[in-house]
Design a protein with these regions (language model features):
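Conserved acidic catalytic loop of the alpha/beta-hydrolase fold
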Residues: 134, 150-163, 169-172, 177-200
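Gly/Ala-rich beta-loop-alpha elbow adjacent to hydrolase catalytic centers
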Residues: 202-211
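N-terminal cap/lid segment of alpha/beta-hydrolase-fold proteins
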Residues: 22-60
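Short substrate-entry loop that stabilizes the transition state in hydrolases
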Residues: 71-83, 89, 100, 108-109, ...
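Short beta-strand/loop motif that positions the catalytic acidic residue
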Residues: 297, 303-305
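Short beta-strand element of the alpha/beta-hydrolase
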Residues: 61-70
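Conserved alpha/beta-hydrolase "acid-adjacent" motif
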Residues: 210, 310-317
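Catalytic active-site module of serine/aspartate enzymes centered on a nucleophile-bearing elbow/loop
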Residues: 339-341, 345-368
């Protein structure tokens, strides 16, 4: 019985994502980047990135949107939802944007050459506790507010619920450490922009730093960044441990700073004396005078966090760091925009199009 429910949900997803705007939007795909490497059996390609395109017949926006998924995910995060609703890719194509949805190198349809890093996967238990059923586990204070993950019944957001099972079926491997993926996406993302021209980058979670490194690599071709709950906060982890992370501020790998930095230890830091509010972390920032992120100066950036996500405790720190480093960064808490109950997987939750509309409004005001 359960398998029939799962199969039914899969058919719904296929129907919804395959037909949305099909008469007005041209669908296609190509690969960006990549190079041949030697193996015992001969040469294979490594580092290439699958790119799926949705090009409206009438493109009305000046720049396309490139959507980059997070850890253990694929571009399906943006092409539909596990319960068969419209995804962000189709929504933004309907708004007049050309849309490009990627699978990160060594992920999904971007084949892993086996030469990059170690491979791991998220367990179902991790997803339940951190993404889909957080109100049941309450591992951080805001988790109790989570209401927007789709599904019905007592197992909503957990194994046995057909929507959760569809979501978990979509999970793939991820590379560790994150610095490996940063380097791969920096190169492939630059190759993508070299092909399509100037673009807006939309990131989520693990891919948050990928927006920063692509802009660092191709500053003239990145016209804006939307960072949905980007990996953070600066310099050290939060909520699930406080070990060092993102030693270059918002990335694991080198960024161009002014004055220049050759070793991340040269970036002098200081912790804020007080947090911005209850259940929020105290941010790490640069000691003044702060170095500037050379290639991100005045770049329009939107960072936003969801009300019930573990990111609610610290995403403001990422936005603060960017602003201190000369980036034109805005920070929005979804609940302050009247969008309540969301967890980390904002693009597939029940009100995903309400969130997309908020992003669309910001883009209309800030990207020229």
């Amino acid at each position: 019985m359960l398998s029939r429910k799962i199969a039914g949900a899969a058919l719904i997803v296929a129907a919804m994502t395959g037909c949305a705007g099909a008469q007005n939007v041209k669908h296609g795909y190509f690969f960006a980047g990549g190079h041949y490497i030697d193996t015992k059996g001969g040469q294979i390609m490594a580092g290439q990135m699958y790119v799926e395109s949705r090009i409206p017949a009438n493109v009305t926006k000046p720049y396309p949107i490139v959507m980059i998924h997070g850890a253990a995910q694929t571009g399906t995060n943006f092409t539909g939802t596990p319960d068969g609703r419209k995804g962000w890719a189709d929504y933004f194509a309907e708004q007049g944007y050309a849309v490009y949805v990627v699978d990160q190198p060594a992920r999904g349809r971007s084949a892993d050459a086996g030469n990059a890093g170690s491979i791991t996967r998220f367990t179902a238990n991790i997803l339940e506790r951190r993404f889909t059923a957080t109100a049941k586990f309450k591992e951080w204070p805001q988790a109790a507010l989570h209401t927007q993950f789709p599904g019905d019944g007592p197992n909503k957001g957990q194994r046995g619920d057909p929507v959760f099972d569809q979501f978990y079926a979509s999970q793939v491997q991820l590379l560790r450490p994150n610095s490996v993926s940063e380097k791969l996406v920096r190169d492939a993302g630059a190759a993508l922009l070299d092909r399509i021209g100037p673009a807006i980058i939309l990131t989520h979670s693990q891919s948050g730093p990928f927006g920063w490194v692509i802009a660092d690599e191709r500053p003239k071709l990145v016209k804006g960044i939307v960072a949905a709950e980007p990996s953070g906060p600066p310099f050290r982890n939060a909520v699930f441990g406080t070990q060092p992370g993102r030693l270059w501020g918002v990335t694991e790998t080198p960024m161009a700073y002014t004055p220049a930095v050759s070793n991340p230890k040269d970036i002098a830091t200081v912790e804020e004396s007080t947090a911005d509010g209850p259940n929020l972390v105290k941010c790490m920032k640069q000691a003044e005078p702060a170095r500037k992120l050379t290639n991100l100066q005045n770049l329009p950036v939107l960072v936003f966090s969801a009300e019930a996500s573990y990111h609610a405790a610290y995403d403001h720190c990422t936005a603060k760091y960017l602003k201190q480093a000369g980036v034109k960064a805005d920070f929005v808490r979804l609940e302050d925009a009247g969008i309540k109950g969301n967890g980390h997987m904002v693009m597939i939750e029940k009100n995903n199009l309400e969130i997309a509309a908020m992003i669309n409004g910001w883009l209309d005001k800030n990207i020229r």
